[in-house]
């Protein structure tokens, strides 16, 4: 997961994918995510997620949230399978 403004890795907070870019795969999926991020100033990061249940890698526009409860709620609102704890590099299934 990288900061959309400076492309530097984000090392803390919880990454929550945005529903509008879920199911983005391959180079065209990555291009779709980058375009979406450039058009939505509220999105502060983008990255990828490996789903071990189906062995697929997803690209996502992402919001970084500092509070776990808020991140979980935002994840549920966006119909996400999981969010990611960037400080501890752990997936949190919802």
Please tell me what each predicted stretch does.
Residues 1-94:
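Conserved, structured core segments of small domains
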